[in-house]
From Swiss-Prot:
Organism classification: Eukaryota, Metazoa, Chordata, Craniata, Vertebrata
Cofactor-binding details, from the entry: Binds 2 Ca(2+) ions per subunit.
Name under which the protein is recorded: Group IIE secretory phospholipase A2
MF annotations from Gene Ontology: calcium ion binding; calcium-dependent phospholipase A2 activity
Active site: 65, 109
């Protein structure tokens, strides 16, 4: 009996390194073709923290990612430090992990990476390294 394709893909897992930021970065780069650092400090939500109204759809992806991490923190997870397992095909990301926190963190990162890919046309260099003082408007709820 042949193993399911998802199991075969898990044999090609990305190595684990220092929290999940490296893992998230790999997802972003593979899904968008852009260096992950281009999403750090983008708009009002990509990077550490976030407030006010997102500047575009790419920034909304980061807002949703922040909300996802916030929900996990309320459940007792530490998503910024969770190391998880994942594999990537051309069009999708498959998550795995020993714990629910690992799997859910991977799912948060997966949704954000796929959101970035879906909204590549909204990425605007003028929002890269965007000063937080330029962020305006109310902070949308999760």
């Amino acid at each position: 009996m042949k193993p399911p394709i998802a199991l075969a893909c898990l044999c090609l897992l990305v190595p684990l390194a220092g929290g999940n930021l490296v893992q998230f970065g790999v997802m972003i780069e593979r899904m968008t073709g852009k260096p992950a650092l281009q999403y750090n400090d983008y708009g009002c939500y990509c990077g550490v923290g976030g407030s006010h109204w997102p500047v575009d759809e790419t920034d909304w992806c980061c807002h949703a990612h922040d909300c996802c991490y916030g929900r996990l923190e309320k459940l007792g997870c530490d998503p910024k430090l969770e190391k998880y397992l994942f594999s990537i095909t051309r069009d999708n990301i498959f998550c795995a992990g020993r714990t629910a926190c690992q799997r859910h963190t991977c799912e948060c990162d997966k949704r954000a990476a796929l959101c970035f890919r879906h909204n590549l046309n909204t990425y605007n260099r003028k929002y890269a390294h965007y000063p937080n003082k330029l962020c305006t408007g109310p902070t949308p709820p999760c």
